[in-house]
């Protein structure tokens, strides 16, 4: 037996290791394959039947997909410890608007949501460097190449002696959800996995 899961990269490396470890203590013989991606990839994999369920953004998903459970996660700004903005207690999009950003690809839900929030106040953000890996993003930040706006979960393991993490005001949240095909009946393995996953997902912020 095998469990196939599509998952946002920003969630997979933070939440899934401990959940999978616990799941395997109960189901050691079930194989698990994780399909990591951004944006519409998660729901596409669900619709195509490539995976049993997806963990992705519920801001943008097609009608062929249903939401099992939903949580909110806030965004934060990440910069080098000695950055000029590090002395501020909180960061606004106006503070960041003129700065070079290190960002996820345009296809990512994160990028789309941030751009939409900026446009509401008449800002077009300067996405000077694009990468699809957080480790690469953080290395670029340390090199002084820019600032990033990321979900708070991805900064849990950052070395706070090198990085400064600041709250963004007004708060920007994204909605995360477990996604399944509409009218899909979950199998026992999926149900057991979600039973372990959902409490962790709710604590993501």
Annotate each predicted stretch with a short phrase.
Residues 62-69, 73-74, 88-89, 135-183:
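Beta-alpha-beta core module
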Residues 38-51, 56-57, 107-164:
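Hydrophobic hinge/microswitch elements
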